[in-house]
UniProtKB/Swiss-Prot annotation:
This is Large ribosomal subunit protein uL4m. Belongs to the universal ribosomal protein uL4 family. InterPro entries: Ribosomal_uL4 (IPR002136), Ribosomal_uL4-like (IPR013005), Ribosomal_uL4_dom_sf (IPR023574). It comes from Neurospora crassa (strain ATCC 24698 / 74-OR23-1A / CBS 708.71 / DSM 1257 / FGSC 987). GO terms for biological process: translation. Component of the mitochondrial large ribosomal subunit (mt-LSU). Mature N.crassa 74S mitochondrial ribosomes consist of a small (37S) and a large (54S) subunit. The 37S small subunit contains a 16S ribosomal RNA (16S mt-rRNA) and 32 different proteins. The 54S large subunit contains a 23S rRNA (23S mt-rRNA) and 42 different proteins. Residues 113-158 are annotated as: Disordered. Keywords: Mitochondrion, Ribonucleoprotein, Ribosomal protein. One of its GO terms (cellular component) is ribonucleoprotein complex. Component of the mitochondrial ribosome (mitoribosome), a dedicated translation machinery responsible for the synthesis of mitochondrial genome-encoded proteins, including at least some of the essential transmembrane subunits of the mitochondrial respiratory chain. The mitoribosomes are attached to the mitochondrial inner membrane and translation products are cotranslationally integrated into the membrane.
Length: 325
């Protein structure tokens, strides 16, 4: 068995040697090596020479904004004026507007609530019943807070609810509210003399006393409603606030009767909250200039250099004026 196994082993070794010699005799083929590349690889293409360019022009912020002055009630453009961007093109600051509205609300609180303490209630200060022997609870004077009609413990007294706010912050809130209206196209500037053009026939009849009070009020209320609806300024459009330099009889009387359509305010009676409540602001040109002049303390310095103080930006510089015929 052992000899038989050795014989088979020799035969296998001879076969392997013959196979190796035949492999050496065959010519070797040169295999071409192809470059490997990932199909999903990201290739960064070099930028073309005509695409790249250097920006040499500096950024120039907006310094002035145009304001169109209209005639009323025709709403025809009469002039084009220039206002500083620091007056009518400020970014919206809700925090500053909130501070201003809270400041105004606190200033309008009267704080007149007042109650009487036990020392201010009128009446005798005699003890109402003996301390002992009655079987009831101990009772002192009628002024005791425990008794009906007695004094109030820790009751309210007249106080001042007003808070403080830096004037420069408050002035900035005014111009921020105007800028918000201007950017949204809700600031309409008109020529001076803003008033409602009531019909002449009605004014003649009302001036002659030929109409009753109820008939006059009803006619004015209906006329104001139709007038505001025709301009899309009425109740359906969010109402309108008219601001004038002084009181105009037709304008103020009309909106006292038709308050659902809008309201009319004099310049001294306007607050920051009034500029934000209604759908739009219609203001006279002179009233707008005075409003901005009174609220630009953060733009005007008190320091004088060589006897001169820095003034605020220009207000309402006329660029174009329409001819009058």
């Amino acid at each position: 068995m052992a000899g038989k196994g050795l014989k088979s082993l020799n035969e296998a070794m001879n076969a392997l040697s013959i196979a190796s010699k035949s492999c050496r005799a065959l010519p070797m083929r040169q295999s071409s090596i192809l470059p490997c590349r990932r199909s999903m690889a990201s290739v960064a293409t070099p930028p073309a020479a005509n695409i790249t360019r250097s920006v040499s022009e500096p950024w120039q912020p907006i310094t002035n904004v145009p304001v169109t002055v209209y005639s009323f009630p025709e709403l025809e453009p009469r002039s084009l004026e220039s206002y500083s961007a620091r007056h009518l093109h400020l970014p919206l600051r809700r925090d500053i507007l909130h501070l201003a509205v809270i400041y105004e609300g606190d200033s309008t609180r009267r704080g007149m609530a007042s109650t009487k303490t036990r020392y201010e209630v009128h009446g005798s200060h005699k003890k109402m019943s003996p301390q002992k022997g009655t079987g009831n609870a101990r009772r002192g004077t009628r002024q005791s807070p425990l008794m009906k009609g007695g004094g109030k413990t820790f009751g309210p007294k007249p106080r001042d609810f007003s808070t403080k706010l830096n004037k420069k912050v408050y002035d900035l809130a005014w111009r921020t509210a105007l800028s918000y209206r201007y950017k949204r196209g809700e600031l309409i500037v008109t020529e001076d003399g803003l008033d409602l053009p009531l019909p002449n026939d009605f004014l003649w009849l009302a001036g002659g006393g030929k109409l009753s009070r109820e008939l006059e009020d009803g006619y004015v209320r209906k006329w104001v409603h139709e007038f505001m609806t025709s301009l899309n300024w009425g109740k359906e459009a969010g109402r309108t606030t008219f601001i004038t330099g002084d009181k105009r009889p037709n304008l103020f009387t009309g909106f006292e009767l038709a308050g659902a359509e809008g309201r009319a305010l004099e310049l001294w009676d306007v607050d920051v909250k009034d500029l934000l409540e209604t759908g739009r602001i219609v203001i006279e040109r002179s009233a707008l200039k005075e409003m901005i002049e009174d609220h630009q303390s953060d733009l005007v310095t008190r320091v004088a250099v060589q006897g001169l103080r820095q003034k605020g930006p220009n207000l309402g510089e006329v660029l174009v004026r329409a001819p009058r015929y």
